[in-house]
């Protein structure tokens, strides 16, 4: 039964006594179902992403709910929902936009498009499911399949037989881990740039080789792993001056495609024959997002919404077969207060190579 007196949620607030402008608020309105395809989910656990502290820091919106990745139980469904009541699912919403004040994962209830949610098999825990969420795989999906990004046609259901090498810089990040698996299962040969300690994980996920980002010969090491095959596709999950330089140096002299996840100064782009796109995972939701910044402001894109839906169907089959792995998980206690504590840990850089998850409720 839905709460009569509103819900508890983590919201953005200038009155916060924390390092981040976040507080736990009570009596919050439940988010509406914005389309007939949406469902309302009772949140069981949430997964944290760097975007959750970056957005509230750089694009603060007073009183907006926070949080993207969640796992929960479907308790209300729109008339065209593809999911029934009572199902345990994982997914995400992008709450960091002015037109979406009440929806977000860090709450007792969240809404999401049923076509982009994954049904959770019995062998996957709530915390693991929150770690899968949708931000990581959704961002990777758009980077891989968007014609303006890497424009790679392969999918797990119809792999590309060419085995093209694809560079994944930040292979041990949440998005990188999903990208390596999705690329490998789609017929590609992912090459991961990561720390030496994360190399075994990236190899176990399907990377054909790894290069250390601390190596002075990183770009040469990447090319050696490709064994003479020209690298024409790079996904940069870090997006700083060093990562971009290595990606551009690794791409073929004849050009290629570079997808990254954050805006960058024009001076970093030292090669003009490279097609570049800054990938925003929220483009898969088919909503207008205006953050007052030219790079991060996007119009609703039905084509990318369809890409995300297609990959959701692909991921569902892989999840059912046990073929999808997440980052190593670390549970943080404290429910909603624990969410704020964990985000501050992420912001300080206290967490390396792990996905933080917080229990919000238990299945009834």
UniProtKB/Swiss-Prot annotation:
EC number of this enzyme: 1.-.-.-
Name the record gives this protein: Trans-enoyl reductase sthE
UniProt family annotation: Belongs to the zinc-containing alcohol dehydrogenase family.
Function: Trans-enoyl reductase; part of the gene cluster that mediates the biosynthesis of the phytotoxin stemphyloxin II. The first step of the pathway is the synthesis of dehydroprobetaenone I by the polyketide synthase sthA and the enoyl reductase sthE via condensation of one acetyl-CoA starter unit with 7 malonyl-CoA units and 5 methylations. The C-terminal reductase (R) domain of sthA catalyzes the reductive release of the polyketide chain. Because sthA lacks a designated enoylreductase (ER) domain, the required activity is provided the enoyl reductase sthE.
Alphabetized UniProt keyword annotations: NADP, Nucleotide-binding, Oxidoreductase
Subunit structure: Monomer.
Gene symbol of the encoding locus: sthE
Top EC category: oxidoreductase
Residues annotated to bind NADP(+): 51-54, 172-175, 195-198, 213, 261-262, 351-352
GO molecular function: nucleotide binding; oxidoreductase activity, acting on NAD(P)H
One Pfam match: ADH_N
């Amino acid at each position: 039964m839905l709460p009569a007196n509103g819900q508890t949620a983590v919201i953005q607030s200038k009155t916060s006594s924390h390092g981040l402008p976040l507080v736990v608020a009570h009596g919050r309105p439940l988010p509406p179902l914005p389309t007939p395809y949406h469902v309302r989910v009772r949140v069981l656990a949430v997964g944290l992403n760097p975007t959750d502290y970056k957005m509230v820091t750089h694009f603060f919106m007073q009183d907006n709910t926070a949080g993207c990745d969640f796992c929960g139980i479907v308790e209300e469904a729109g008339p065209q929902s593809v999911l029934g009541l009572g199902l345990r699912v994982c997914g995400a919403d992008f709450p960091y936009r002015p037109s979406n004040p009440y929806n977000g994962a860090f709450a007792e209830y969240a809404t999401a498009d049923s076509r982009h949610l994954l049904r959770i098999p019995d062998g996957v825990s709530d915390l693991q499911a929150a770690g899968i969420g949708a931000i990581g795989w959704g961002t990777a999906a758009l980077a891989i399949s968007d014609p303006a990004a890497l424009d790679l046609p392969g999918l797990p259901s119809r792999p590309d037989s060419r085995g093209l090498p694809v560079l994944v810089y930040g292979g041990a990040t949440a998005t990188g881990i999903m990208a390596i698996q999705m690329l490998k299962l789609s017929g590609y040969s992912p090459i991961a740039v990561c720390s030496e300690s994360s190399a075994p994980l990236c190899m176990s996920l399907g990377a054909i080789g790894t290069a250390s980002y601390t190596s002075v010969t990183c770009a040469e090491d990447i090319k050696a792993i490709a064994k003479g095959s020209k690298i024409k596709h790079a996904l940069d999950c870090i997006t700083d001056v060093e990562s971009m330089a290595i990606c551009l140096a690794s791409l073929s002299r004849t050009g290629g495609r570079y997808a990254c996840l954050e805006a960058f100064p024009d001076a970093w782009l030292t090669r003009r024959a490279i097609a570049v796109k800054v990938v925003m995972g929220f483009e898969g939701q088919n909503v207008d997002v205006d953050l007052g910044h030219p790079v991060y402001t996007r119009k609703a894109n039905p084509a990318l919404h369809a890409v995300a839906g297609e990959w959701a169907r692909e991921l569902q089959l892989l999840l059912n077969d046990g073929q999808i792995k997440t980052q190593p998980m670390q549970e943080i206690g404290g429910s909603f207060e624990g969410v704020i504590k964990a985000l501050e840990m992420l912001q300080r850089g206290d967490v390396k190579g792990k996905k933080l998850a917080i229990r919000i409720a238990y299945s009834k």
